Amino acid sequence: MKYDHQQIEAKWQKFWQDNQTYRSDDNFQKPKYYVLDMFPYPSGAGLHVGHVVGYTATDIIARYMRTKGYNVMHPMGWDSFGLPAEQYAIRTGTHPAESTQENINNYRRQLRALGFSYDWNRELATSDPNYYKWTQWIFTKLYEKGLAYEAEMLVNYCPALGTVLANEEIENGKTKDGGHPVERRPLKQWILKITAYADRLLQDLDLLDWPESLKKLQINWIGKSEGAYVQFIEKTTQEAFSVFTTRPDTLFGVSYLVLAPEHPLVSHITASSQQQAVRAYQAQIASKSDLDRTELNRDKTGVFTGAYAVNPVNHKEIPIWISDYVLMNVGTGAIMAVPAHDERDFEFAKTFKLPIIPVYDPVCEEITIRNQVLAGQQCWPGHGICVNSACGDLSLNGLNLDQAKKIVINWLEINHKGKSATTYKLRDWLFSRQRYWGEPFPLLKFEDGSVRLLDEDELPLCPPAITNYKPTGDGKGPLTQIKEWVEIIDTKTGKKAFRDTNIMPQWAGSCWYYLRFCDPHNTEKAFSPEKEKYWLPVDLYIGGVEHAVLHLLYARFWHKVLYDCGYVHTLEPFQTLRNQGLVVARSYQNKMRVYVEPRYVEQRDGKYFDSRTGEELTSQIDKMSKSKLNGESPDEIIQEYGADALRLYEMFMGPLEKEKVWNTDAVSGTRRFLNRFYEMAFSDKVTNETSEEGLKLGHRLVHSVMKDMELLQFNTAIAKMMEFINEFTKLVTYPKQVIQMATQVLAPFAPHLAEEVWEHLKCEGSLSFTPYPQVEEKYLQENVITYVVQINGKVRGRFDLPKDQTQENVLEAAKNNPHIQQYINKKEIGKVVFVPNKLLSIVLR
């Protein structure tokens, strides 16, 4: 009987949909498991196979946990507000709501075709008024707690997109979305005070089962620094200004000060002889982004103001410069430069021939380095013993860093010259966008400058229907053009009022969607306390690491605010998080750097050619993307090989968290495995009789795959299924009981085929909730030993063999093992040490 994947998959998808198999009930008596994907933005391109990795992983776990007795919630929704839909509307004239719904329908079709066990009754979209009503409501809570405020500030403005962007949305001076140039402009914006939660965002990372690398990204982004504020006095004007430093112990080594070009003090202190140069420099750097300005490898630039400040510890006069590497929104917008012990200061000092004063002796270093450091010829950012650091009643000479730091901070505080302090790199979150397709701000502004938050019964505030979505180009959004929407009479006060013409960023809706999934149809509340208490926290969250300092940081911030307001009971939203690795694929370009579709590419002698023109192409491995024409749609693969084969291949390519190179042809390998499984289950050899050997194979399979499932090691679990079928099909007859066990193990990975086999074996009910097989220890006991192989004293491999093998047999097995072979590599074996049932040690000549 042939394995007809199209017929089987259509049959079982209809069964699941008709029976609402995966609908999760709020059964508070049953242990819950909440498994969640980072929900997608529904783009016009649809899903590609790179997206499928994370969705397959969560589906495997959702299916597995149902068979372990858990009440599983596995929902799906759409992050449907945002710039891409609006850009599409500008190009085509299609309203974003219309194009977004079309894209959602396509995504839903693709996800259903993959057999994912989502609870579609909980489906939501952030652009649905029934959803964003509560996004706006949460904003009112932020405002009431003093965490939302308006301020004019220098912002990252993208002329091409016509909107302001947060630092997190920019990379190498360009927008992450589209790579458009960004400039700095002063604009009045809505800002969320995420910095008020900086310490808690850091501390509570310890509560989470997240990859350490991801935690480190958040730790570095928050950037907690402990040090001191030091007060300097400008000599002529006597104006005081503060500098934050993590190294107050180096104050005696300060040889110049640097202000951000935008610092308000610059215009007051600049000498008349330097005013023209300072203004020219300010104009020159005005359009540079923060990232451009702080790039470590770029040439150092700056201008002397002609002013001097007095060093509080030794009363020496220090020149004051301006330079673009100092940012007004970091620290105080001023730094003290110690070129002898800071690489960037050292480069700046060398460029402008400024003094270099060493105040640390690197006593443990070799004499040449030590002499160069003490002569000011080499920068030494490390520790040592303080030198050249005494004046009056303050002496740090002979002290180490910790001792010196403590004493100088104490001296600064006693003498009212400074104080200890903790600062953060994290900036408050720029929360407004000058676009149309997003949540309007739920408030009214009055002519006297006062603000009224909209009451809950006035929500949602929906954007007006418009036909022109283009940004105005003056930093204002398209809503400014709709006077009848902007200027109104407030029905509750009778006063003339103005609606805000900015909208919230795309991140707003994704900050809390995991909460709405708990209670998606509630019209009275964002979610009920009982359901939140039952379902939260999310037990497993899977998505890309690129969201580390965007969505994940923002969602944690909102959650903590809701916790403080008493709306949620957990300190954190996502207990366990895993990142899936990128799926990359070959892309091809012609000599004009135009990308060529893979279907037009042919390979000859290791080179690539355009089959239409014969032109040789360049090829590289790239992240899958529509622009590079290397994003493979799952639709064609499902048609040819089946959803189960695709799901298996997505997981078999490699460890979940690692980058993987896509190869469509390799899907045939997992399809062949499914063919074999199907043929085995439908074979005439299937018998109701059991066998010791068959039961051992079955129980070992269940035992080993369960361990892999707990660790999300899906590739090795699939490998074990393949090993199982190799051994099992060597049996004279196939015990039905063992096939049932193997089918249950396969089910989370290839659910359509597994259901078909289960039905054929005349087993009761759907596999979806059939308890996972119980392992019997007696079938795990086997006369099999794992031998450790050492080569020249280093462990080079392990393999299993039956117990009590001779040295000759174990040595022969080692020689034939591909992994161990590469270390022997035809070299002569000089000596062999054999410990029976444990170790084989080989010494090569």
Swiss-Prot record:
It catalyses: tRNA(Leu) + L-leucine + ATP = L-leucyl-tRNA(Leu) + AMP + diphosphate. Keywords: Aminoacyl-tRNA synthetase, ATP-binding, Cytoplasm, Ligase, Nucleotide-binding, Protein biosynthesis. One of its GO terms (molecular function) is aminoacyl-tRNA deacylase activity. A motif ('KMSKS' region) lies at residues 623-627. Its EC number is 6.1.1.4. ATP binds at residue 626. It is found in: Cytoplasm. A motif ('HIGH' region) lies at residues 40-51. HAMAP family: Leu_tRNA_synth_B. Belongs to the class-I aminoacyl-tRNA synthetase family. This is Leucine--tRNA ligase. The lineage of its organism: Bacteria, Pseudomonadati, Chlamydiota, Chlamydiia, Parachlamydiales. The gene is leuS.
